Amino acid sequence: VTELHKRPWLVLAGLALGVTVTNGFARFAYGLILPAMQSDLGWNYAQAGWLNTANALGYIAGAVVTMLMIGRYSATSLFSFGLITTNLALLATGLIAELWWQTLWRVLVGFFGAMSFSTAGVLAAGLFPNDPRRNALAIAILFGTGGGLAIVLSGASLPLFLDHYGADHWPLAWVIIAAICLLFLPLCLWSAAKLKRPAPPQAKARAPLPISQIWAQLAGYAGFGLGYIVFLTFLSAWMTQQAASASFIAAVWILLGLSICISPLVWRAILARHASGLPLAMILTCIALGSALPVLFPGNISLLSAAVIFGLSVFMAPSAVTNFARQNLPAHSWGAAISLFTVVFAVAQTLGPYAAGLLGDLAGDIGISLLGASGLLLLGAVIALTQKPLPNPPRGQIAQSGKQE
């Protein structure tokens, strides 16, 4: 505990690198390696799409299992176990090319990644228990900078690596990613250990969540899951459809990642000030704008602007629901609440790309799918806007943060 008080930001850095592994490399690097895998292995779009679905199904299962286990095992144990196993699964992905092997490990990457990702928020929520503003910033850095770092590193290196060495070197790309994640592991595990606390009393751990009072926030977060993933899934395809060069595509991804990294600075005050659904509604509106902009106004400037707007907002949605849980629920309910939000998100993001793909096929233009995703995000924003702060919040937390609607 003494070391935590002395070096809380170093502890946060370890947690953020955990998100870099589980939410960055484990999920978004796949989209950059996939073209090489398709080219080398002769996969069709159905096979490539199946691996995305397999990963999402694993993520759902991992989120559900975490929700069931969070009352019995500490967040530290679940975070550490999920992180180690995600690292091993990333390494295994580069060993054998057969589709059944790739399916197995994409499922497990999703499963273990969800376990570590959802508990990272629980751990970060306890970093500054008596300083809501710093706590809001810490949670935003966890998801924003942690996830954005992986997109910057992946976007800057993977396309160039595969272009230089050839598509048949995709297995080595996975091994390199696993090696980088392995370097992060010691600090990640150290940070989690510094935040280890005794398991909560069983009676409290099993106390039901006030779902009837937080349904609007849950529905808004479902809209986030449905909409954001469409942009990230089809961004490269849309740019290719618009005849963008490989270097420009890489530049857009790097700009997107850098914007994600600095997004905590943009949203920290809003996240700390409001205990209602307003922060999530504002974030979803910005994501919707970023998704629609390149379709409504085609061109390089529009794409670069969309990358900035989308990047400054997209990873703040998990920060918004984590802060909402922290500001409105007692500490022993944070784990269950964040796990529930993760389950809702996981189911929604599984449906999003499939539905968007169907819409794009019917319309003959993937841009229609981006507009559809923008509409879902706006609907989620409207619903989230109706979320009010809960009555009887945890004593001391909201009063210090200047709770507003």
Model regions: which residues?
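Conserved MFS/SLC helix-loop-helix module at the cytosolic interface between two early adjacent transmembrane helices
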Residues: A61-E98
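C-terminal transmembrane helical hairpin of 12-TM major facilitator-type secondary transporters
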Residues: A275-F324
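Helix-loop-helix hairpin linking two adjacent transmembrane segments in secondary transporters
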Residues: E98-W101, R134-A193
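Cytoplasmic helix-loop-helix junction between adjacent transmembrane helices
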Residues: W105-T145
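Paired small-residue
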Residues: A89, W100-V109, I301-I309
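Helix-to-loop junctions at the C-terminal end of transmembrane segments
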Residues: G62-S74, S263-A275, G360-D361
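A late C-terminal transmembrane helix in Major Facilitator Superfamily
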Residues: R326-D365, A373
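Extracytoplasmic gate region of multi-pass secondary transporters
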Residues: Y30-G31, Q213-P264
